[in-house]
Amino acid sequence: MNKQDTTLLSANGYSLSLSVFPAQKAKANIMFVHGMEEYKERYIAFASFLQEHGYNVITSDLRGHGKDAPQLSHIADKYGDKLIIQDQQAITKYIETTFPDLPLYIFAHSMGTIITRVLLQNDSKKYQKVALSGYVNPNPASGVGLGLTRLIKVFKKPTGHSKLINDLAVGQFGKAIKDRKTELDWLSYNEDNVNKYIEDPLCGVEFTLASFEALFSLLNQMGKAKSYKDVNKEMPILLIAGDADPCTGLEKGRKASLDNLHKAGFNDVSTITLEHMRHEILNEDNKQKVYEDILEFFDK
């Protein structure tokens, strides 16, 4: 494995932490966008796998995430939704400059799929393929969550926390798992993965109110199919998730995500629903099948 770490100055002077996995004879670039309350090093194994199969992979920590974050799980005091999109635009430009004349793909997971879909609303023609893992479903109630978060933030400040908002955003996922041993069993059937996440000081740190404001704002924007402009209609998009992933909204939510992209104008959207898998499909016991499914999508 060849991995090079670097930093990139983004909007409002924020320093983004990047890892670059250059392939010997690259056929395309793949930009990773990770999920909420985790960090880029959790994707080293999958990034290395894609690197070995001929892809330059670029991973990064979302602002407020990872070991270099000024304050863990705090995206920004304000405008976090806009800043996090500007970060991905800056990374896109970095990749285009560093590895020119190659197709650019995206692999995104969880909250990263929300960010990616908002990114595509204005920039879809910059990318040639997109794979969305553990994709969050459009939720009409996101506007209510956004309003409530903003109200509580007035009294508790941007860096404050709220159990009510945390429960509203992610609390239902744990409750969806019967006979659960922990509140994070929804992450995977793989208990070792769940325990590692719980024990990792860089994982599961509760979002601040300003971060939840950014999350709800992005989720609200993601659901607006009419917000997609100058759509790259024939760009292949893969929606891949575990059949028992509550984050997708299960069967009804998965259909809502598919319908939303079709309404936005994307004609080539495929789905893979994996049996006996939950949210973190890359960390389930049968992760090799997931690796191969995503590789096949990028290769074809």
Predicted features along the sequence, with ranges:
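Active-site glycine-rich loops that stabilize anionic/oxyanionic intermediates
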Residues: K27, H34-E38, S110-M111, D243-A244
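N-terminal cap/lid segment of alpha/beta-hydrolase-fold proteins
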Residues: M1-K25
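Alpha/beta-hydrolase fold nucleophile elbow
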Residues: F99-S110
